[in-house]
């Protein structure tokens, strides 16, 4: 049974499955999953008109009703990641109402999975993720290797699983830095398979 912070698959819509067996630490590029961002005083109300339930608290996330996730970044900003809903919201927000502002999301999106994730985080980030209660579905805005990131910790296949978003202009640097550390920890890259 899936707990509130446990992903059934990477995309949580049974479309994406891990191909390789996870070793102690793996990295995967999830930038191909469509994203949509919106902010503003009436963003929450506008999302409600689109039948999107939002997390109750700032800096938290929840699953969407049909898969995917929505993160509440602060009070009035939201990040939606889903293969179906995100493109629909992009279209619906081409002419947004007053006090609703679309946010272009061109992030590099990666995930870290494996029992050595915390070891990597200790080397790259000053935030203590071990102190979190992931059952509360936290969204953490911090820096990793000097790059501002948004992080959602969770569990996938009974292992720590961290989704990480960063500005794409810093993506190559962050990937290079993380891959070097992952290599030192005897980890590697993992493949994903999209099921049609």
Predicted regions and their residues:
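Basic, glycine/lysine-rich polyanion-binding surfaces/domains
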Residues: 1-196
């Amino acid at each position: 049974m899936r707990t509130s912070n446990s992903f059934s698959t990477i995309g949580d819509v049974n479309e994406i499955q891990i191909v390789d067996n996870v070793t102690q630490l793996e990295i995967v590029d999830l930038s191909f999953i469509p994203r949509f961002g919106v902010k503003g005083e009436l963003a929450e109300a506008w999302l409600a008109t689109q039948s999107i339930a939002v997390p109750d608290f700032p800096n938290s996330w929840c699953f969407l009703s049909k898969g995917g996730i929505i993160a509440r970044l602060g009070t009035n900003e939201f990040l939606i990641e889903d293969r179906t809903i995100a493109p629909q919201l992009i279209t619906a927000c081409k002419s947004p109402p007053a006090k609703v502002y679309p946010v272009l999301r061109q992030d590099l999106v990666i995930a870290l999975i494996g029992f050595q994730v915390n070891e990597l985080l200790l080397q790259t980030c000053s935030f203590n993720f071990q102190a979190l209660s992931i059952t509360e579905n936290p969204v953490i805005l911090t820096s990793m290797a000097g790059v501002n990131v948004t992080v959602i910790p969770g569990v996938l296949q009974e292992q720590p699983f961290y989704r990480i978003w960063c500005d794409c202009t810093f993506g190559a640097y962050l990937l290079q830095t993380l891959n070097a550390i992952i290599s030192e920890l005897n980890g590697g890259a993992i493949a994903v398979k999209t099921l049609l």
